[in-house]
């Protein structure tokens, strides 16, 4: 395997100078090796890290220790979204995804947002919720009173579980309690509000819930059953905003089309499901690339969207100049320590490419990516339709499935797109003609 030569001019004291721009015109036209060289120079990847990207990223012995009954590893394409300027910093965003056009769409949206200064973001903090279910209570409201009266004791007991987290400024910060009606009668639900710092937080929160459960049983006289983290991270929100200049994105008609598409999603849950799915295309791809629990992120996002009726996670408005202003608010329980983020070699490399060191920064980037992905989808729907870009890339997959290799792939795709026949049988027919 040929090892790429990295341009050491971009290094200083062994670290990359991140003054390089993520705006890389023609990046998609480069070969895989040329793209990786650009990324390696941007992120300061070592020769060993470059080799890991080009070879099997997850060794079988590591995979066998991660989950049960391992028989192999399953790979996804790893792409790079370019052009992202977030809070004044340039990012190349790694995305692991099988769906065509997602990476290209995000890059194009980021290029348009960049014309107006890129994305600005906000983060509410790394607070997670641990739930303790208290049942069999004669007087649920009296039990709630007792929990809140002794919340300092509960917090102290919870923090005994993780002195290191407490020393870092994290730990259990508050207690909430509420009585709910269920088909099994009234229950008291106690929430531990835990600052998990740079972790996703499941292990720390679950351990705390289990630790304080006996004490809560004792002071309430009830029976505790579930003691587990909630994936609705309502206190761990990431927000992003971007202004899309009307002239850059195609004019007033495009702005109106996007606003009409947004209005459709805000009024109709059938459309809204697809609207929010498009947001998660980008975010989940980033989560997979960085070794985060994308199922937890998906669950939290859709649950948050459903509070008060299922609604879009993004909003769009038109400013006084006629430009489109997009915003997003989404729960973002991500981590940069623990779990697969430090076990999977490619996850570690993805975090290095991204250049983030904290969960907060990763959450901010994810929110910006989700907004970019959603804007790109709405713009495509409001103009040429989503299928054009999808089908051109789908044609490439079909050409490969038909057996095309090397330059044959481009020729088969060109003919299928020209003839408007994006089908596997036609791909095979075209390939047969080319080879005859």
UniProtKB/Swiss-Prot annotation:
Reading the lineage from the top rank, the first entry is Archaea
Gene Ontology terms for molecular function: hydroxymethylglutaryl-CoA reductase (NADPH) activity
Q: In which pathway does it act?
A: Metabolic intermediate biosynthesis; (R)-mevalonate biosynthesis; (R)-mevalonate from acetyl-CoA: step 3/3
Q: Does the keyword Transferase apply?
A: no
Transcription is among the record's keywords? no
Enumerate the UniProt keywords alphabetically.
Isoprene biosynthesis, NADP, Oxidoreductase
What is annotated as the active site? 99 (charge relay system), 277 (charge relay system), 293 (charge relay system), 390 (proton donor)
Q: What is this protein called?
A: 3-hydroxy-3-methylglutaryl-coenzyme A reductase
| Species this protein is from | Archaeoglobus fulgidus (strain ATCC 49558 / DSM 4304 / JCM 9628 / NBRC 100126 / VC-16)
């Amino acid at each position: 395997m040929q090892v790429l030569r990295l341009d050491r001019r971009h290094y200083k004291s062994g670290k990359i100078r991140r003054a390089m721009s993520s705006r890389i015109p023609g990046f998609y036209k480069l070969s895989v090796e040329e793209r990786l060289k650009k990324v390696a120079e941007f992120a300061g990847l070592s020769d060993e890290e470059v080799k890991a990207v080009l070879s099997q990223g997850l060794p079988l012995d590591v995979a066998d220790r991660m989950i049960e009954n391992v028989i192999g590893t399953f790979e996804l394409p790893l792409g790079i979204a370019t052009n992202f300027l977030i809070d004044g910093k340039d990012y190349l965003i790694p995305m692991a995804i099988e769906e065509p056009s997602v990476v290209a769409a995000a890059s194009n949206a980021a290029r348009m947002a960049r014309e107006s200064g890129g994305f600005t973001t906000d983060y509410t903090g790394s607070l997670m919720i641990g739930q303790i279910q208290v049942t069999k209570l004669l007087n649920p409201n009296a039990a709630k009173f007792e929990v809140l009266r002794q919340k300092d004791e509960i917090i102290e007991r919870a923090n005994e579980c993780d002195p290191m987290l407490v020393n870092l400024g994290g730990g259990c910060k508050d207690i909430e309690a509420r009585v709910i009606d269920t088909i099994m009668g009234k229950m008291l639900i106690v929430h531990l509000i835990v600052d998990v710092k740079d972790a996703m937080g499941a292990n720390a929160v679950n351990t705390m819930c289990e630790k304080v459960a006996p004490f809560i049983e004792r002071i309430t006289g009830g029976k505790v059953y579930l003691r587990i983290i909630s994936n609705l991270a309502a206190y761990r929100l990431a927000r992003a905003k971007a202004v899309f200049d009307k002239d850059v994105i195609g004019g007033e008609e495009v702005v109106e089309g996007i606003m009409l598409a947004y209005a459709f999603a805000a009024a109709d849950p059938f459309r809204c499901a697809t609207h929010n799915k498009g947001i998660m295309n980008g975010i989940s791809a980033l989560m997979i690339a960085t070794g985060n629990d994308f199922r937890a992120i998906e669950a939290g996002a859709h649950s948050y969207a459903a509070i008060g009726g299922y609604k879009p996670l993004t909003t769009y408005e038109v400013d006084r100049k006629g430009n489109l202003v997009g915003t997003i608010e989404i729960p973002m329980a991500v981590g940069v320590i623990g779990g697969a983020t430090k076990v999977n070699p490619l996850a570690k490399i993805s975090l290095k490419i991204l250049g983030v060191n904290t969960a907060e920064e990763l959450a901010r980037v994810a929110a910006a990516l989700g907004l970019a992905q959603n804007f790109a989808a709405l713009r495509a729907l409001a103009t040429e339709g989503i299928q054009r870009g999808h089908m051109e890339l789908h044609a490439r997959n079909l050409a490969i499935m038909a057996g095309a290799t090397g330059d044959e792939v481009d020729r088969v795709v060109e003919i299928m797109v020209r003839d408007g026949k994006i089908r596997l049988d036609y791909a095979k027919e075209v390939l047969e003609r080319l080879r005859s």
